[in-house]
């Protein structure tokens, strides 16, 4: 056999060995660790037998370390003995998780007048009904007055936390900025789509900033900039997710997030430690203290009876959660019932989808779901920020509420309810549909809100069981808490914004429970609706719900929590306790105090040792080494906070580095070595062939038969 033929099998065997030996996470677990400010994290890691990896970009005193797999017991013991001395406050295992894109499958005189008026020559503009709907006048974003006034999103950057942006697309080249962009999946600067289904981010970006040229259609805010933060092309850890949501948060103004946990009617998932703190960090320190604007798609699980209050990203008070309405003002099949969504924007349904950009310089007519609705809201926010850059993240949410347009819907279960503040609210559409002209008009003269305040009720212990009790079947329970005038005054409360409710209800079929919150005015928010596919047997363990339905409603009076077993007593569980929190605008902005965000996020019985995160169907490991009780024995009297302060976590005020300082992944190492070995193999083969040919040419010709004779 020719020696060169042996190289292939030998190389394959060697590479297989190389891959198995190079994977750093093959034998190690990655952990997030928080240390005391004065502690050297490398020394602290060594003190517990771990290897230091790198700092977390966005959070001070938070670092990543590696521990050998299977060493949890010994590590815990070591931490208990030496962790506090080493200055370690908290340890949490990092588990890569998938985040799911929230996509959905599926010329006349007026139109010509509109396009000619604005000089739009894009060939597919006639298909962008969400911009100008000539078939159903008024069923669009109402952009004429905004564009006539010359507002196109200048000096605003929308960052798409997604699967990348094709910034070479002729519709996006001018809008793209590398300043706030990064590929967190491949750890490189350019977030170009690489996989066959990396289309989502490019489509979302085109909705906002597609150029007015002769390609595809146009964007809502064509002079805005777009940045790409690529995270959706592989499972990612909580730490990396948090870095993406804080990346470039002085240059990126809006973070458009059309993704979340699975919309299957079964999942219940929330941000873990680092991402929770990144959201807090963003609203406190982003945009020079005005707050990053986080826009989240509400979810596409309507046909599974899902509810966005089972998603800790969309039910966060820091998120502007956007639902969808179709071209005929019907409820799309994928639309979720949810008390946490502020407003709806146009998207797919009734045989029409959103026309936008697609990778490789192409266009698509099939973008949809709440994935398409959220970028439209981001675009409208960009239009407003271009003329009012002083608006805070809470101002944007207020203007969203006050400018929303309720509408008549052919859908029978739209169910608009008038609130005491004079708004109309639907659990399908929020406060109505987004109207760009109304939003910008309200924003122009908006008086910025005072700093945030809060009132936290004591934990209400109920401790009553569902099911058969003393020959009686218990299926309904009600618990009450009275907010007094004195509490309102001591809490420095002026206007109600968000209401959150934390519950602890172990139940052996979570999907059978319905949870409602009734305000003193009798307005009911559906916090948890029945989910027939949710067979989880743990119930709600310290899960926090949120509602915006009570915005600007008088908070004084009796608040009721109603918990119903919709199975009619077929299942068992216990309503253990609940806690009400009211968030709003302060009366006296000079009377400030640090906000209790992080205290509220920590479980009330966190103790030294491994703790399983309750706010998720996934299990993560946490170790808190400075035992802190966060249970409340009386209502919390608060004042307000400046947008840059908190007493519970150290928050960086500096801009994250333009490029993350990350270690090369084992895939990159293997790829480099593979390339090097293949190059060497080809080089040797060529040299071998050349030498063989050379010696063959130099060798004397073989003797003929006559010469042999």
Curated annotation (Swiss-Prot):
Glycosylated residues, chain numbering: 155, 463, 471, 620
Transmembrane keyword on record: yes
Signal peptide, first to last residue: 1-22
Cofactor: Ca(2+)
Active site, per annotation: 162, 200, 371
GO BP annotations listed: peptide mating pheromone maturation involved in positive regulation of conjugation with cellular fusion; protein processing
GO CC terms: cell surface; Golgi apparatus; Golgi membrane; membrane; trans-Golgi network
MF term (GO), any: endopeptidase activity
Alphabetic keyword roster: Calcium, Cleavage on pair of basic residues, Disulfide bond, Glycoprotein, Golgi apparatus, Hydrolase, Membrane, Protease, Serine protease, Signal, Transmembrane, Transmembrane helix, Zymogen
Places the protein is found: Golgi apparatus, trans-Golgi network membrane
Transmembrane segments: 669-693
Pfam families reported for this sequence: P_proprotein, Peptidase_S8
Propeptide: 23-82, 83-102
Bridged cysteine pairs (disulfide): 216-363, 308-338
Membrane topology per record: Single-pass type I membrane protein
Catalytic activity, EC: 3.4.21.-
Protein modification: N-glycosylated.
Main location: Golgi
Family note: Belongs to the peptidase S8 family. Furin subfamily.
Job of this protein: Membrane-bound, subtilisin-like serine protease that processes the P-factor precursor and other precursor proteins. Essential for cell viability. Cleaves substrate on the C-terminal side of dibasic residues.
Protein name per its UniProtKB record: Dibasic-processing endoprotease
Gene: krp1
């Amino acid at each position: 056999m020719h020696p060169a033929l042996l190289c292939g099998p030998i190389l394959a065997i060697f590479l297989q060995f190389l891959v198995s030996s190079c994977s750093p996470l093959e034998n190690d677990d990655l952990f997030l660790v928080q240390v005391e400010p004065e502690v050297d994290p490398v020394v602290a890691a060594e003190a517990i037998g771990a290897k230091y990896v790198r700092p977390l970009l966005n959070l001070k005193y938070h670092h990543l370390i590696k521990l050998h797999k299977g060493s949890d017991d010994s590590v815990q013991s070591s931490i208990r003995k030496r962790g506090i001395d080493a200055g370690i406050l908290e340890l949490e295992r990092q588990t890569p998780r998938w985040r799911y894109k929230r996509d959905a499958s599926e010329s006349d005189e007026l139109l010509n007048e509109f396009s000619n008026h604005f000089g739009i020559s894009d060939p597919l503009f006639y298909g962008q009904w969400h911009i100008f709907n000539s078939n159903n006048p008024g069923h669009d974003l109402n952009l004429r007055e905004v564009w006539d006034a010359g507002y196109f999103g200048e000096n605003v950057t929308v960052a798409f936390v997604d699967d990348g942006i094709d910034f070479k697309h002729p519709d996006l080249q001018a809008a793209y900025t590398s300043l706030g962009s990064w590929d967190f999946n491949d750890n490189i600067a350019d977030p170009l789509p690489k996989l066959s289904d990396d289309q989502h981010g490019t489509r979302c970006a085109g909705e906002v900033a597609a150029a007015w040229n002769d390609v595809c259609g146009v964007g809502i805010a064509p002079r805005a900039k777009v940045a790409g933060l690529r995270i959706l092309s592989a499972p990612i850890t909580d730490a990396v997710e948090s870095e993406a949501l804080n990346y470039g948060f002085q240059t990126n103004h809006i973070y458009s997030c059309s993704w979340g946990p699975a919309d299957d009617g079964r999942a219940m998932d929330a941000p873990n430690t680092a991402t929770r703190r990144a959201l807090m960090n963003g609203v406190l320190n982003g945009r020079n203290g005005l707050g990053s604007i986080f826009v989240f798609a509400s979810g596409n699980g309507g046909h599974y009876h899902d509810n966005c209050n089972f998603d800790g990203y969309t039910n966060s008070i820091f998120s502007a959660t956007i639902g969808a309405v179709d071209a005929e003002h019907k409820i799309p099949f994928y639309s979720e019932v949810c008390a946490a969504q502020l407003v709806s924007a146009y998207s797919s349904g009734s045989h029409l989808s959103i026309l936008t950009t697609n990778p490789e310089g192409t266009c698509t007519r099939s973008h949809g779901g709440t994935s398409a609705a959220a970028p439209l809201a981001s675009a409208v926010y960009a239009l407003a920020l271009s003329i009012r850059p002083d608006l805070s993240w809470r101002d944007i949410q207020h203007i969203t509420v006050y400018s929303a347009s309720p509408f008549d819907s052919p859908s029978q279960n739209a169910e608009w309810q008038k609130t005491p503040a004079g708004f109309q609210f639907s659990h399908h559409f929020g406060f109505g549909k987004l109207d760009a002209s109304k939003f910008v008009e309200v924003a122009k003269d908006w008086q910025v809100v005072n700093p945030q305040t809060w009132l936290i009720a004591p934990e209400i212990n109920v401790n009553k069981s569902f099911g058969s009790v003393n020959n009686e079947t218990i299926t309904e329970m009600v618990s009450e808490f009275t907010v007094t005038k004195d509490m309102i005054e001591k809490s420095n409360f002026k206007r109600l914004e968000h209401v959150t409710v934390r519950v602890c209800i172990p139940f052996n079929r979570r999907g059978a429970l319905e949870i409602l919150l009734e305000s003193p005015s009798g307005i009911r928010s559906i916090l948890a609706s029945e989910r027939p596919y949710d067979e989880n047997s743990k119930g709600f363990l310290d899960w926090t719900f949120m509602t915006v339905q009570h915005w600007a409603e008088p908070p004084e009076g009796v608040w009721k929590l109603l918990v119903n077993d919709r199975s009619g007593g077929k299942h068992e569980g216990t309503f253990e306790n609940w806690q009400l929190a009211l968030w709003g605008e302060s009366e006296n902005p000079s009377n400030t105090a640090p906000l209790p965000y992080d205290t509220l996020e920590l479980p009330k019985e966190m103790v030294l040792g491994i703790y399983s995160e309750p706010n998720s169907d996934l299990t993560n490991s946490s170790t808190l080494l400075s035992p802190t009780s966060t249970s409340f024995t009386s209502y919390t009297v608060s004042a307000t906070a400046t947008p840059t302060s908190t007493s519970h976590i150290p928050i960086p005020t500096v801009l994250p580095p333009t490029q993350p300082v990350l270690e090369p992944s084992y895939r990159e190492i293997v790829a480099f070595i593979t390339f090097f070995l293949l190059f060497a193999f080809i080089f040797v083969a060529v040299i071998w062939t050349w030498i063989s040919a050379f010696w063959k040419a130099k060798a004397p010709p073989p003797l003929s038969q006559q010469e042999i004779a």
